[in-house]
Amino acid sequence: MSIVVIGRGNVGGGLAALWRKAGHEVTALGRGGGAASGAGVVVVAVPGPAISAALSTVPGLVGKIAVDATNAFPSRNEAFPSLAEEVKSFTGAPVAKSFNLNFAVLYDQIAPQRVPPGSFYAAEDGARDVTGELITDAGYDPVPLGGLDRARAVEDLAWALIAAMKDGAPVFYRFAVPGEL
């Protein structure tokens, strides 16, 4: 799959590395922008308040499936029901919300886990399968929460996950049926 990641920080750079390792063709764009025209999917991995500024420097977004990995720290654009909806305003195509609840500092510790950690996502129909594949290829177990109308709930879970950190250390999360662990 051809992926353009907008944002080269801990999340964007880390996901780009995981997907390259899984065999995807990945281009990571930084503050200088760049084009998304050759991508099959665009992943937005910038601070939530920077979505508009970051995406306005990237031509070729219209019609691209997008995965929003942003968080609303320290604030969100209240003109949209979720940050994922703000991303959709730039692409006009199916969007998913994911990867905002997976700590980037743990990316290099995914593979050694006995079972893959979970990754929540909310997605529109046209983005659901692609997002599930990207989650799996990053080493996580996809945990679907429904359509894009659930994106705000995924965003708001960030506060709960931060509160669940063990002695200030980031955590993996996993949902399993009895006997799976």
Tell where the protein language model's regions lie, with residue ranges.
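Hydrophobic residues within alpha-helices
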Residues: 15-16, 87, 131
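General beta-strand structural signal in soluble alpha/beta enzymes
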Residues: 28-29, 94-100, 143-147
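NAD(P)+-binding Rossmann beta1-loop-alpha1 motif at the extreme N-terminus of oxidoreductases
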Residues: 1-34
